[in-house]
């Protein structure tokens, strides 16, 4: 026969068991939350928004890279500087364009309890499940373009492409008598970048003397991929006047044209990203005429600062634009200085606002409002 004390112990044990079951069920339900899936327009970021609880995770900022192209390395430089300034441990992984490897690397970061993760996805769809788990764990997840993310970085993609396309169209009219064979090196594996190439086609559409002789995505979006694709294109179209795309593939295409002995000073090679090698080519005054800057170390530094703020329980932007600007010989010196000193840019509101625009607010307590749709500031 049970004593009163034993019955009380049993009741307490039962209550505790029920609580644990409820708590486990509640936690599981939380993991099933899907974030913001319906596209919306975020208001301007409020830097004075209330703080919330900080996550109880390691003060580590990790960067999961798709590859080691210059644009990605620039992001890493900015992140490393921010981590140093905010006393965070900085760690990186490189997937070498292998989607399965990236999933394993991100899962390793998640299971080790890193407090902040920035990711440049290889395959956004396959990576999404582990990113959602990472977000729900309480980790800051900053994504370069595709969702899901605590805070998503994008560029106004149509405007970025139009800035390059309009510059090419102007050059064709003024320097090539309105006639040109054009190559567009696209990025079909990342649908979120497609507005760039829509804009380039729109810019060239009204020029009757323009023939787009190739509109194709290289097998790999890097210098080697651009080189290989351009070699193939030159077999069918040995005379090319204009090449447009991301800097890394356009640089590869330029190398292929040089290798074939088909380079001319009046050609127009133009890219996007403001990569170091592209800037060096522009300085030479040769066929590489322009690069549309997406200052990677500047926004990398900003993402690192947001990661540190998140870990302190502060409210950070849900989304951020990196604004495009056309690099010319006249403004390259200032641009290079900004890339080398992104912390100075970030601390100067006037300079920062020429590169970045921030939207929405989110913190650890409101992480159920993570971005799970392809956000763009150009959405109407």
Q: Could you tell me what each predicted segment is?
A:
Residues 124-159, 181, 275-284, 288:
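Flexible loop/hinge segments that line or gate small-molecule binding clefts
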Residues 2-13:
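Bacterial N-terminal signal peptides that target proteins for export
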Residues 30-59, 305-380:
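Hinge/cleft segment of the Venus flytrap/periplasmic-binding protein
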Residues 61, 65, 79-81, 164-210, ...:
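An alpha-beta-alpha
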Residues 116-135, 199-200, 219-281:
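Hydrophobic alpha-helical
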Residues 62, 113-121, 140-144, 183-184, ...:
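Periplasmic-binding protein-like
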Residues 35-78, 82, 90-103, 108, ...:
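Extracytoplasmic "Venus flytrap"
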